[in-house]
Amino acid sequence: MSGWSHRHILDLASFSLEDYSSVLELAHRFRSMPVTGARKLPALQGRLVATLFFEPSTRTRSSFELAARRLSADVQSFTPASSSLSKGETVLDTARTYVAMGADVLVVRHSSTSVPEQLACALDRSGERTAVLNGGDGLHSHPSQGLLDLYTLAHYFDSQNPLPEALQGKRIVIVGDVLHSRVARSNLWALTACGADVVLCGPPSLVPQDFVAFVEAPPPGQSHDPVQHRGCVEVVRTLEEALPGADAVMTLRLQKERMHQHLLTDLNRFHRDYGLTHERLKLCGKPVPLLHPGPVNRGVELGGSLLDDHSISLVEEQVRNGIPIRMALLYLMAAVESSSDPSLAAIG
């Protein structure tokens, strides 16, 4: 883990294969912790993690707070409804309040793109040592979700060694509202960086053709590692094109709250054309796992019986894996700050 250099975690565009390996390897160690007895590690004892969620969340917020507590960190939660935002306080001033209270990490979720990055830059300019972890910003990025999905798939393909190599050459199909999904963007970066080929499936209004260019272009000021084999991205319009040969399928929620009026999709028609069922998954030609980042619209993205079929659905596994992945991220950020690895002696 000595190669880890990300003080802030804002997206996955700049992650190297070594970075993905560091997160997945550490998360797997945390996942292997016994579920009974002493469930806390002293790694972040004396540290303060503040969760600043300016947008509603159930899974992500709870997962980060559980992750921080399992590493013995103190946790402070921010709730917009009872905050000074209603009195005109800015997001930056709110963040600075928690920094002044001694927060070591701010986990920030916001409906507007780039807010976590703007906060990180502002804190850096003022010489603060507080790190910022993006808990989801607008349509841009949701790095911890992308990483937990990556780990869930790697563990499915190789439970003994769930590292990026387990994704090499796999065909992963993502169905649904890609346009409005920060999860899709993070998954595209993670999966292709680890050598998986990704097929995006949906109507043109929800799956633009230019998403191929989105992944193939390197981040500003960077270049792709010429040695690293990156997966390809393909856009198709029907499940009949997408599913044959798939190794895993992920479906995305229709995010009506982010859609302009002319993009609103008839739900019955969407389910007819793109809703996943047991019968449709037979097009894959073999048993494949099903993922969904949640929350799920039953009867829209997929049939309720499919969601409840634990021989296929990895949705609850994704939720479980969110905790060790977020423990790994918080641990690695703390290691950068202290220039040494906090103790992991309790898990060997």
From Swiss-Prot:
Molecular-function annotations in GO: amino acid binding; aspartate carbamoyltransferase activity
Gene source species: Prochlorococcus marinus (strain MIT 9303)
Top-level EC class: transferase
Keywords on record: Pyrimidine biosynthesis, Transferase
One GO cellular component term: cytosol
Pathway assigned in UniProt: Pyrimidine metabolism; UMP biosynthesis via de novo pathway; (S)-dihydroorotate from bicarbonate: step 2/3
EC annotation from Swiss-Prot or TrEMBL: 2.1.3.2
Protein name per its UniProtKB record: Aspartate carbamoyltransferase catalytic subunit
SUPFAM superfamilies: Aspartate/ornithine carbamoyltransferase
InterPro entries: Asp/Orn_carbamoyltranf_P-bd, Asp/Orn_carbamoylTrfase, Asp/Orn_carbamoylTrfase_sf, Asp_carbamoyltransf, Asp_carbamoyltransf_Asp/Orn-bd
Gene3D superfamilies assigned to the protein according to its UniProt record, in alphabetical order: Aspartate/ornithine carbamoyltransferase (3.40.50.1370)
Annotated function: Catalyzes the condensation of carbamoyl phosphate and aspartate to form carbamoyl aspartate and inorganic phosphate, the committed step in the de novo pyrimidine nucleotide biosynthesis pathway.
Gene Ontology biological-process annotations: 'de novo' pyrimidine nucleobase biosynthetic process; 'de novo' UMP biosynthetic process; amino acid metabolic process
Binding site for L-aspartate: K87, R182, R253
